[in-house]
UniProtKB/Swiss-Prot annotation:
Name this polypeptide is given: Origin recognition complex subunit 2
Molecular functions per Gene Ontology: DNA replication origin binding
One of the GO biological process terms: DNA replication
Biased composition annotated in UniProt, kind: Basic and acidic residues: 23-41
């Protein structure tokens, strides 16, 4: 057997040596110092980075824990409602399978969620009204002694004042009214139902006796311009709470037109929303000439809460009592059949007599006695229409049965039914 050939590695001929540049001892020392400096800097950077990472990790953990706690508190209504809707959908799918145990379990979950998301609004109101305000009264007195004079100077110089900050500022404006007792002023609550820029223009025209009524087909901007021209020889100070209210956002151009004459119409207003200034563009902000003043009262905004859209308090748009007026109820009434109109009166009679949610089967028995509905299915059909028009809302009681709560205030319902010759019966004293 022939021996395999062993291949030898080729040797490379050494090339000509490249002469190495010799450095002086001074350069060697400086180079070594630079190297040591870089190593020290890298060590310091690494140690600082490790410390920052440790602190960052601790801060992130703290922030995440705080955020989760805040979200669990303030977002509980939303998450609970979503879970309740999911439970209802599961209950509907399982009803066809006849699985009664799962249905009962879902009912218990929905009942627990409903109880968890309930908010005792009367109790909340009583707590806020009984709160000790001595500290706030001292701050308000200090504000009146030191700042109210400056505010009047701002108004006299042709500027408008915009108050913002944490807490309700209604009492601040109420106290400032005392400083304006020698002037002509008008206080407006922009959150009040039915109040907007057009209503404000009508009130100015009537109270200032301008005789500048709106013409047929005249725009709000043109009407505001006419009122401004009529007020050349008069002066008015507008005090507006929550000028960023939804009904005021669309007519800000007309409002700016009214304030164009700074010698005649002056403004001091409050805002609460963090993005409230976005309702004005840059040109409008320039014409309004706001002096922004921060006032942190830290007072609970009771009126703002009750007229707002807080889902946590159950005052969202679907249950807000200020969402109905006489005209809206009249339109809804005309769309109802005669039996549905009788049911409307019967439900609110039972609801306002007991001042508690009306159980569905109690309402059905009463409706059956009055020949309004012969079956529970017919009654549910009528009540669904009431719910769609935000007249009542469905909840589930402690016993698992459906119950109904009215979301239109007593004064409005009483006045409306009297106009329809179907007044509510007065509750007899026991």
């Amino acid at each position: 057997m022939p021996r395999p050939k062993i291949l030898k590695r080729a040797t490379v001929q050494p090339s000509a040596a490249v002469p190495v540049k010799k450095s002086t001892p001074e350069k060697e020392g400086s180079r070594q110092k630079k190297t040591n400096g870089k190593e020290n800097a890298s060590r310091n950077l690494q140690s600082n980075l490790e410390e920052d990472l440790e602190q960052l990790g601790f801060e992130d953990e703290t922030v995440s824990m705080a955020q989760s706690a805040i979200e669990n508190y303030f977002m509980q209504g939303k998450s609970a409602s979503e879970r309740m809707n999911n439970a209802k959908s599961r209950r509907g799918r399982r009803a066809g399978n006849g699985n009664t145990e799962e249905i009962e379990e879902d009912d218990e979950i929905s009942n627990a969620i409903t109880d968890f998301t309930k908010c005792d609004l009367p109790g909340l109101r009583n707590y806020i009204t009984k709160k000790d305000n001595t500290e706030f009264e001292k701050r308000l007195e200090h504000l009146a002694d030191n700042d109210f004079g400056k505010w009047k100077l701002y108004l006299a110089a042709g500027f408008n004042i915009l108050l913002h900050g944490v807490g309700s500022k209604r009492d601040v404006l109420t106290e400032f009214e005392n400083e304006l007792s020698d002037y002509t002023y008008m206080r407006v609550d922009a959150r009040k139902d039915g109040l907007n820029v057009k209503v404000l223009l009508g009130a100015i025209n009537e109270n200032m006796k301008l005789n500048c009524n709106v013409k047929r087909g005249q725009s709000t901007i043109s009407w505001a311009r006419s009122i401004r021209r009529k007020m050349n020889s008069q002066q008015l100070i507008l005090i507006i709470d929550n000028i960023e209210a939804p009904d005021w956002r669309s007519d800000q151009e007309a409002f700016c037109e009214l304030l164009e004459n700074r010698d005649s119409v002056k403004l001091i207003a409050t805002v609460d929303h963090i993005y409230s200034t976005f309702i004005w563009n840059s040109r409008q902000l320039s014409s309004l000439s706001f002096v922004h003043i921060t006032i942190n009262t830290f007072e609970i905004p009771l009126q703002e809460l009750m007229t707002g859209d807080s889902r946590l308090l159950g005052l969202d748009a679907r249950s807000n009592q200020s969402s109905h007026t006489m005209s809206s109820l009249d339109v809804f009434w005309k769309s109802l059949a005669v039996n549905s109109q009788k049911l409307f009166r019967l439900f609110f009679q039972m609801y306002f007599d007991t001042k508690k949610p009306v159980k569905f089967w109690d309402l059905f028995n009463a409706a059956k006695d009055d020949f309004i509905a012969s079956t529970d299915a017919a009654l549910r059909t009528q009540l669904v229409e009431f719910k769609d028009h935000r007249v009542l809302k469905w909840t589930r009681g402690d016993d698992g049965n459906d119950q109904l709560s009215g979301i239109v205030e007593l004064r409005l319902v009483t006045e409306f039914l009297e106009s329809k010759n179907m007044p509510l019966d007065e509750k007899k004293d026991e």
